[in-house]
Amino acid sequence: MVAQINLKDVRNIGIMAHIDAGKTTTTERILYYTGRSHKIGEVHDGNAVMDWMEQEQERGITITSAATTCIWKGKKINIIDTPGHVDFTVEVERSLRVLDGVVAVFCAVGGVEPQSETVWRQANKYFIPRVAFINKMDRVGADFDHCLAMIEKRLRANPVAVQIPVGSEAEFAGVIDLIEGEMYAFDDATLGQEVERREVPTEYKERFTAARISLLEKLADFDEELMEKFLDDELISSATIYKALRKATLALELVPVFCGSAFKNKGVQPLLDGVVNYLPSPLDVKPVEGVDKDGVEVSRKADPSEKFAGLVFKLMSDSFVENLAFIRVYSGTLKQGDKVFNPIKGKQEKIGKLLRLHANKREEVKEIVAGDIGAVVGLKFTTTGDTLCEKEAQIILESMEFPDPVIGVAIEPSSKADEKKLTESLAKIALEDPSFVVSQNEDTGQTIISGMGELHLEIIVYRLLNEFKVAARVGTPQVSYKESIQRSHSAEGLFEQPTGSSNQFAKVVLEIEPLERGAGIEFVCEVDEKQIPAEFLGAVERGVVDSLDSGPLVGYPVTDVRVRLVGGAYHEEDSTEMAFGVSASIAVRKAASEADSVLLEPIMSLEVITPDEYLGDAIGDLNKKRAKVVGVEVEGDLQKLLAHVPLSEMFGYSTSLRSATQGRANFTMQFLAYDVVPANKAETIIKKIRGI
């Protein structure tokens, strides 16, 4: 069991990267060198500790965020190893929301890849300090300097090398520490556990000196004491450099860069030193902010004696317990048996067991204190993004935003007996994964499951069949289209109906107008209480939003519109929330149906890496898919082709790219935006959906 540790000695970090950059392998080495595991697990052998799901072991990728805790030099490090595949980007988003620092892992050959950029943007959004680890220095084509330059150019970051590699590819022998001025060699016989300190090799002294001066010059811009010593040519102690570098890292001014080969057991211990030296403790992070029950801004500092506040950032159904809720405690102390309040749901929850996790293993603890991460058993009402707090000291912390799904498949039970089981299992998975949506096709009655990509849905179907033991039939993947409008239109909704001894009455006048792509739905109230009392406005907005779930064109959700409430009427005796909800629904449906509807489709950002001789074939193949080529970059002896392409054209793209390039190209893609489907294509899609 991990002993209680002072908050200044806690690090809550995530390990993040593009797929195949070596995140999980790096994490496995961290667990081994910190004594958390007693043998090294390997991704390629299917026995990595952090990849514990069966599908993770089969596919050799991380699918769900796995959490663990280890100790390094007296510091407790809570680690979340996250997926690198774009289909599971929601796992990264919700992990970053509760982390204080990030280790960004880059492949020394591939450098900054598409998902690296996505993760970096997500970390920027939450103002998270980070260190970088340039991994796979032993691979053919490894280039430390090029990777460093890519971090600066592609990520618009300010990287600063704190190490340089000794050799590369098969000759990679260790690293030179630019602060301590010595080389670290990692003993193969002890799987890198024994680290030998050596003098800087003679042939590297010139490069070492230049790299150290570059480090000091960058630091001098952010630390006056160091600048004075540097300009006066005084001796600068290691302690002064560590202090200045920590300050610049926490201020998001610099990113310390390490290097190594996790697979070859080289460079991981210095990276761990970097985590404790440069990444923040909960005390270094500003107090978490939220609003109280009256909407007044309040904050809570990381102090176990403060009033309790925590954020649930993930739910997981489990074969051992019904519901496992991952929580970051921001203030106060959470104890077994506590009664806490969920201000989002307006419900009280009783805390069952509290757990500290190590991948899929767990140990029971009596309490989770401010600044720490753990899991709770027994919550009945709480979902991802909810705040838990004390009822007498309520606070609602900022929740999380999750992307809309872009692809769906129809699913149906194999028999009547499986119907209930399928419904319950889908509900459990949807509770765990906010980017997974279950809906019903009103015309066909089919159940549609939607997610972030083909792999995402493949994994969910696999879990249904194997983990939940549901017998089901699955259709072919379908694109999740949306609808929007091209011009403004207004309409009136009147609901007048006798119910028993009284009448129901409500009148609403709405105007709908188009917004720019990505704007979502805006509702604006432009009436006064004489027309519609304030108590009914919530019902009007709900009626509008609910109705826009199904558009007039072919029933897809309507987006990128502003709905203005411009008029209405009520009766003192006969008006109700229900009546106003119905009248709003009538009005918005009328207005949208007359506003020149258009079909929107998901556009993907595509990156193809191909040998030079196949570039023309790859472009020709994309031209058949309505793709827009936006750039070509040289990557060593390869070409990087950048394009925007409709998702509907990308089914089976692996096969067509393999055919066009004789299997020598590969690609990655991620969601970019929704855009209007060309009229001729839209007509074909609409006819197909309507069965014409």
Curated annotation (Swiss-Prot):
Gene3D superfamilies: 3.30.230.10, 3.30.70.240, Elongation Factor G (Translational Gtpase), domain 3 (3.30.70.870), P-loop containing nucleotide triphosphate hydrolases (3.40.50.300), Translation factors (2.40.30.10)
Purpose: Catalyzes the GTP-dependent ribosomal translocation step during translation elongation. During this step, the ribosome changes from the pre-translocational (PRE) to the post-translocational (POST) state as the newly formed A-site-bound peptidyl-tRNA and P-site-bound deacylated tRNA move to the P and E sites, respectively. Catalyzes the coordinated movement of the two tRNA molecules, the mRNA and conformational changes in the ribosome.
GO cellular component: cytoplasm
Family statement drawn from the similarity comment of this UniProt entry: Belongs to the TRAFAC class translation factor GTPase superfamily. Classic translation factor GTPase family. EF-G/EF-2 subfamily.
Domain tr-type G: start-end pairs: 8-283
Binding site for GTP: 17-24, 81-85, 135-138
Protein name from the UniProt record: Elongation factor G 2
Gene Ontology molecular function: GTP binding; GTPase activity; translation elongation factor activity
